[in-house]
Regions:
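N-terminal cap/lid segment of alpha/beta-hydrolase-fold proteins
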Residues: 1-25
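Conserved HGGG/HGGXW glycine-rich cap/lid loop of the alpha/beta-hydrolase fold
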Residues: 19-72
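Conserved acidic catalytic loop of the alpha/beta-hydrolase fold
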Residues: 83-101
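Conserved hydrolase catalytic core segment
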Residues: 99-143
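Alpha/beta-hydrolase
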Residues: 147-234
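Short beta-strand/loop motif that positions the catalytic acidic residue
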Residues: 239, 245-247, 251
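Conserved alpha/beta-hydrolase "acid-adjacent" motif
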Residues: 252-258
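Catalytic active-site module of serine/aspartate enzymes centered on a nucleophile-bearing elbow/loop
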Residues: 268-314
Length: 325
């Protein structure tokens, strides 16, 4: 049995429009900041169980942020994914963060790109772990569950509130049977995800995250899917910040080709393939993700001389094999 990671701080901020935004902090207080965006579904406790040890060892302050409609974040559907950057601007201002790296798991990936686009002089680098690709316009990728949801985007728009309440009710009903539900989900998952779920602390982390994330509302899941099927408000082609992708080559939810597709659109992107892993395999690479992002931090020893606002390079994708934590 493992132990879920314990936040150094667990709280909320108030935005200028009166909404609340939930967040948690892990790792080194006062260290270089990494903002972590959870998956879909997910909340602020969805993070590697080793986050404190890995972040402390590297002097990193990890801040996990809940999107509107989950945990302690007030329900709110932004018009576009890009509008999430306004919430992050206020959060970082209130927490005293100027420059930062960002990382996002699965559904958190598009929000990483949005912030990198919005703050090219503040975001030093970004990581996308099994991230969702655009579904609209010339940047769209084919296949995957989000592409399927795109076919139903009109009813999703109309039914988002009742669907959110339905998911919330289902989560509340299942929580007393969390252990049993987890084991059923584990057995029906691909081998790569089963290995992740069996790692020390993963089960406890996921159960805690769903429990605390669904206490008040659980609408963020539906809001995310609705936003994924809209125009994002920007193109990955215009993201000048270095972005690194981690993606399992057996991902059954977001195909590996999606990671390569989005990376191929960007001026400075690389893909780290995770052989034999599925959708959640990149959670096991959290230490590697930290090391790569810190290596791109311009003011750190041994970091490259280029800055996030450097002139655009010729678009390229380089594939490397992931090595775990």
């Amino acid at each position: 049995m493992g132990i879920e990671p314990v936040p150094r701080r667990d709280g909320t901020i108030t935005l200028v429009d009166g909404r609340r935004l939930g967040y948690a902090e892990y790792g080194a207080e006062g260290g270089d900041a990494l903002l972590w965006f959870h998956g879909t579904p997910g909340a602020r406790h969805q993070i590697s169980p080793d986050v404190n040890a890995l972040a402390d060892a590297r002097g990193v302050r990890v801040i996990t942020v809940e999107r509107p409609g989950v945990g302690d974040s007030t329900p709110h559907l932004h018009p576009r994914i890009l509008d999430w950057a306004g919430d992050i601007d206020q959060l970082t201002g209130q927490l005293g963060v100027d420059r930062f790296a960002i990382a996002g798991l699965s559904g958190g990936g598009p929000y990483v790109l949005a912030c990198a686009h919005a703050f090219p002089d503040r975001v030093v680098a970004g990581a996308v772990l099994g991230g969702v690709a655009p579904t609209q316009g010339e940047d769209a990728a084919d296949g995957g569950l989000v592409a399927l949801a795109n076919r139903f985007r009109v009813p999703l728009e109309w039914l988002r509130e009742p669907l959110g309440y339905t998911l919330w009710g289902a989560a509340k009903l299942l929580m007393p049977f969390g252990d049993q539900a987890f084991e059923i989900y584990l057995r029906t998952s691909p081998p790569g995800d089963q290995r992740v779920f069996r790692m020390p602390g993963m089960k406890e982390m996921f159960l805690k995250d769903i429990s605390t994330g669904s206490r008040k509302r659980f609408h963020a899941v539906i809001y995310d899917v609705v936003l994924f099927t809209r125009d994002w408000g920007f193109s990955p082609r215009d993201v000048r910040v270095p972005i690194r992708f981690w993606h399992g080559d057996e991902d059954h939810i977001v195909p590996l080709v999606h990671g390569h597709h989005v990376a191929s659109l960007m001026p400075d992107a690389e893909v780290y393939e995770r052989p034999g892993e599925s959708h959640l395999g990149s959670l096991a690479a959290f230490g590697e993700v930290l090391d790569v992002l810190l290596g791109l931090w311009p003011d750190r020893a041994g970091a490259p001389a280029e800055t996030a606002s450097a002139p655009a390079k010729k678009p390229r994708t380089r594939t490397r094999k992931g090595t775990g934590t």
